[in-house]
Amino acid sequence: MRGLLIDVGVVSRRGVRADRDAAAIEMMRKAGAIPLAITNVSEMAIWWESNNKLHGRTRNPYDLRCNAGGSSGGEGALLAAAGSLIGVGTDIGGSIRMPAFFNGVYGHKPSPNIVSNSGQYPEIVDYRAEFLGTGPMCRYARDLRPMLIALAGTEATGRLRLDEPVDLRQIRVFYMNEIKDRSFLMSPVSNEVRRTLSDVIEYLSSLTLKPAEERNFPSMTYAFEIWNSLMMSGDCPKLIEVLKSSGSTISHPFIEMLKWTAGQSKHTFPAVFMTVGEKYLPSKESESSRRYVALGRELEQEFANLLNDRDAVFLCPTHPEPAPKHRTPVFRGFNFVYAGIFNVLRLPVTACAVRLGEHSELPVGIQVVAGRNQDRLCLAVAEEIERVFGGWRDPSKKA
């Protein structure tokens, strides 16, 4: 946003301000939106907890001990706390949808090439631009549609047919309860999330002409490997190179890790850890990477066969558990892939607030996936979920 900070939580960018509005902000201004603030993100917008060395840690309005998500965690927390009504986020691995889930609001990652990503930092202009979505975050589901219309513009809105009514009775509903991952870095789906998904499915089955149908994809077991391999499948800079180009003095991942251990690093642990991880992940030329890229393309086609050319949605958890405590995401690093897999599958997705957990008293929700350019189906189902289940709850009155 012109004149405001664009440091993305990186110490070497302290004080850097934007010299122009991002394209999405321009579109919102044209629609009459009044900017109130920019909000906190994770360092370089790479992690699903919004914490950095410049602005500190964003806390969850429902429980200050808990994570607000990332990378758009500040936006999610501000919306949940009624500090603003609407916001704009970006999502390349769930960065709109996880904050929406953790903070009990709504967020939509649009179909590719609908909302311009131009003017962001770090700017992604390579093949990954189709995985990145700039989209609306709202306290109320009914605000998603007019926001998406404003962000997308006339031509893109026409492609999405957002003005067409959706007959929910005619929609086919498919769902998945859990990703059966083999890694200790992914949590099992909690009972609260499982029950919430089940209740939404039960309601939609009573509404639609055909009952909801469970669909499991064996290749989802490798969701993280698919996401990572597709993200790294082309020519793109490594994180350490991006940090260096931002003015960081980071020289070697292991040296930086030693500095972090001694309290001398200017970077957060997730950023340092990811630079170390880059040295050990398989290269894009490796046999395993090529295999997972092929598996990802097959999975993309399976979803196209399921969702394209008909009114159908796919429901699944946005995240396997409600907002975890601060600093714990590093022990469950793969949890983000419930959201992230749909970035590389290039599908529109809406994170829907449903209710507060019975035991955790934290927001619990689901995500609604549709076929490419079928965003209107996600939004229609989100509005119905809000109407029936209530959506956002005032965190000051949660008890």
Question: What is the role of each PLM region?
Answer:
Residues 8-14, 190, 328-332, 368:
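Short glycine-enriched, charge-decorated loop/helix-capping segments at active-site entrances
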Residues 50-54, 101-105, 226-233, 331, ...:
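Short low-complexity, flexible loop/linker segments enriched in glycine and/or proline
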Residues 15-17, 65-69, 97, 125-128, ...:
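Short Gly/Pro-enriched turn/cap motifs at secondary-structure boundaries
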Residues 26, 30, 80-179, 198-206, ...:
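Structural helix-boundary/capping segments
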Residues 1-93, 307:
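Gly/Ser-rich catalytic/binding loops embedded in alpha/beta enzyme cores
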Residues 41-43, 92-93, 218-219, 320-321, ...:
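Conserved beta-strand edge residues that scaffold enzyme active sites
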Residues 35, 211-212, 349:
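Hydrophobic beta-strand scaffold residues
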Residues 150-340, 344, 373, 384-399:
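Amidase signature
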